[in-house]
From Swiss-Prot:
Keyword Acyltransferase (UniProt): yes
Keyword Disulfide bond: no
Taxonomic path: Bacteria, Pseudomonadati, Pseudomonadota, Betaproteobacteria, Burkholderiales
Protein name (Swiss-Prot/TrEMBL): tRNA N6-adenosine threonylcarbamoyltransferase
Keywords: Acyltransferase, Cytoplasm, Iron, Metal-binding, Transferase, tRNA processing
Positions contributing to Fe cation binding: H111, H115, D304
Record-linked InterPro entries: ATPase_NBD (IPR043129), Gcp-like_dom (IPR000905), KAE1/TsaD (IPR017861), TsaD (IPR022450)
Catalysed reaction equations from the record: L-threonylcarbamoyladenylate + adenosine(37) in tRNA = N(6)-L-threonylcarbamoyladenosine(37) in tRNA + AMP + H(+)
Cofactor note: Binds 1 Fe(2+) ion per subunit.
A GO molecular function held by the record: N(6)-L-threonylcarbamoyladenine synthase activity
Primary localization class, coarse: cytoplasm
Cellular compartments per GO CC: cytoplasm
């Protein structure tokens, strides 16, 4: 079966075609970063309008790339949440309309399940069970994954997500949007040892995270350096390096602890922060000593994208967990949706 997937939960419009037998056939993505830069963050109304402009041309592009006709598609999938309500409605409306017009089933997919399963698109593909570190702008969670639809929450952030810590710290340093990648680039020129920053909950004994205290510590350092007239470019680079080092140390340590507690030897890292080179380097150094392996999605699939949505739908179909009845195509979106609430069937 060929599944056409749509992602529009925030500021990326993604469309992809996935075959349940052959895998990813084609995908296309449009990022709204340039549009939102002048505002310093995502403007929901502008995001929704841009999704409307982009989603149909991207769909045509994917069908052309894969050499498909509309009649070749066997099902349609879309992100139903969590995300921005207006943005979600664009993708859901297009997906449901297309499914209705072609007489196809429409499969609602949890955005985080898309991220969670995206490393299965990599080669080699991790086998179940594994520990998953789901780390993005809005979420930081450790999950035990025993199969498609079989997820157990091990730990999560109690306040800010890791991606938020990157973005908010970058904003405090006067860096542009998106802040996380800008901070990571600047950190390459810095000395992390110049600033001593806290590692919140590093030794808490559980698998939860907290990054709000780190953000406060960065604010304190920025204010102090500004008062002293010492917040020059090198100081900002050093502070960026120290901030990144603190976040990555906590993420890596908690992931290692999760592997030890579960006895598993496979760690899957998913979400936008999974593209961070220091995180990849740190895990690549430490995990082999534990005879464990880290798996990452391809860099092009770390951000939000349609491929992960179409692929998650394909995995659900193969596992017998997707509702393939056409129904009346009435739908809702869920801006807030805990992955633990996800039904298996």
């Amino acid at each position: 079966m060929i599944i056409l997937g749509f992602e529009s939960s925030c500021d990326e419009t993604g469309v992809a075609a996935v075959c349940t037998q052959r895998g990813l056939l084609a995908h296309a993505l449009h990022s709204q970063i340039a549009m939102h830069q002048e505002y310093g963050g995502v403007v929901p109304e502008l995001a929704s309008r841009d999704h409307i402009r982009r989603i149909v041309p991207l769909t045509r592009e994917v069908l052309a790339q894969a050499g498909l006709r509309r009649e070749d598609v066997g099902a349609v999938a879309y992100t139903a949440g969590p995300g921005l309500a207006g943005a979600l409605l664009v993708g859901a409306s297009v997906a449901q309309s297309l499914a209705w017009s072609l007489g196809l089933p429409a499969i609602a997919i949890h955005h985080l399940e898309g991220h969670l399963l995206s490393p299965l698109l990599a080669d080699p593909r991790p086998e179940f069970p594994f520990v998953a570190l789901l780390v993005s702008g809005g979420h930081t969670q450790l999950m035990r994954v025993d199969g498609v639809g079989r997820y157990v929450l091990l730990g999560e952030t109690l306040d800010d997500a890791a991606g938020e810590a990157f973005d908010k710290s970058a904003k405090l340093m006067g860096l542009g949007y998106p802040g996380g990648p800008a901070l990571s680039r600047l950190a390459e020129q810095g000395d992390a040892s110049r600033f001593d920053l806290p590692r919140p909950m590093l030794h808490s004994g559980d698998l939860d995270f907290s990054f709000s205290g780190l953000k406060t510590a960065v604010l304190t350092r920025v204010k102090a350096a500004t008062r002293e007239g010492a917040l020059d470019e090198q100081a900002r680079a050093d502070l960026a390096a120290a901030t990144q080092a603190a976040i990555i140390e906590v993420l890596a340590a908690k992931s290692i602890c999760a592997l030890k507690q579960t006895g598993l030897k496979r760690l899957v890292v998913a979400g936008g922060v999974g593209a961070n080179s220091l995180l990849r380097q740190r895990l690549a150094e430490v995990l082999p000593r534990m005879k464990a392996t880290a798996y990452f999605p391809p860099l092009s699939l770390c951000t939000d994208n349609g491929a992960m949505i179409a692929f998650a739908a394909a995995e659900r179909v193969k596992a017998g967990l997707a509702n393939l009845e056409q129904g009346d195509h009435a739908f809702t979106v869920r801006p807030r949706w805990d992955l633990a609430e996800l039904e298996r069937g």
